[in-house]
Amino acid sequence: MANMSRLNELVSEFGLVERRLGDPQALADGREYARLTRRHRELLPLVTLVREREQAEADLSGARELLQDPDMRDPDMKELAQLEVGGLQARLAEIEAELEVLLLPTDPDDGKDVILELRAGAGGAEAGLFVMDLLRMYERYAAGLNLKLNVLDAAESDLGGASKVVAEVTGDFAFRALKWERGVHRVQRVPATESQGRIHTSTATVAVLPEAEPGEVNLDLSEVRIDVFRSQGAGGQGVNTTDSAVRAVYRAGTPDEIMVICQDGRSQIKNREKALQVLTARLAERERAAREAQERQERASQVGSGDRSEKIRTYNYPQNRVTDHRLEGEDKNHPLDAVMAGGLAPVVSALARAQREEQLLAMSQEGAEDQHGAA
């Protein structure tokens, strides 16, 4: 049965969030209002289910009273009441299962905007072309979810590929939509430059960095070197005539060095702001990775799917098939043409479902162990 105390806490939080959303001070603070709106959307499905359960329990109680009423002798009415009891009991069991899923641990980063980094791996020019194919796939996927993808920097090649692309993805639950993409992506196809029709295998890596919360990372600007230069990318007249592009280098010349380039727009100020935003996200990711490494060491086990060293997905062009190696059975393979057109939703849904099933299994095992220990 769902944890009642936890449910009550979340319902109370929902009420508090609704009251805060009506507070003029919250409306005046754009960041706080966005946070409250996001939390309201997160809690609404759970609160809706809790209210439905309360109504179903009240209806069930009324139907049972009707069945037990000695003055009720109409057999048709009694049969209807029995059917209602059965239907309500079945629905309450469904609600209970749905609430258990909604109470599973959630990723606190799910509602955040994202820095998306694509890098060519093994395969030379073909890997760079694959990077651009992935970028177009993510652009279409994002558009379908009403997310905005904006390229901040791209190291493009003459053949139409890119060794690196850095983009910002903003909108509701951007991280939740893209977090499953972290890792090594492999492509198998005949490159455009291949004259003998041989299939080549190339790779690209994808990093998905959630935006850093204010105060999450203490970025000391005295440790950041800012360089400005003329943009090297496309953008029409004026792009290359002013020093609008910005390079931010954290702890230059040290093992901790991080370099970020932003040449998205013509405004040096905006490019500087975006570069520091990406730099902060990378620092936050580095700190998270360090914490995870420490946790892995302490429990002497590997953190599964999502490790960047894993090949998470293979794109097989000759067979028009995308295989996600984290999935099993019917969920494992998907039509390549649909996926490359932005149809990632079935893959993402399957991954989220598999994670929920693993969490539910872990919870049931913990519960069984607790009962065994109590016995």
UniProtKB/Swiss-Prot annotation:
InterPro entries: PCRF, Pep_chain_release_fac_I, Pep_chain_release_fac_I_sf, Prokaryotic/Mito_RF, RF-1. Methylated by PrmC. Methylation increases the termination efficiency of RF1. Peptide chain release factor 1 directs the termination of translation in response to the peptide chain termination codons UAG and UAA. GO terms for molecular function: translation release factor activity, codon specific. Keywords: Cytoplasm, Methylation, Protein biosynthesis. Belongs to the prokaryotic/mitochondrial release factor family. The modification N5-methylglutamine is found at residue 237. Its main location: cytoplasm. Residues 289-326 are annotated as: Disordered. It comes from the Bacteria. This is Peptide chain release factor 1. It comes from Deinococcus radiodurans (strain ATCC 13939 / DSM 20539 / JCM 16871 / CCUG 27074 / LMG 4051 / NBRC 15346 / NCIMB 9279 / VKM B-1422 / R1). Residues 289-299 have a biased composition (Basic and acidic residues). PANTHER family: LD18447P. SMART domains: PCRF. GO terms for cellular component: cytoplasm. It is found in: Cytoplasm.
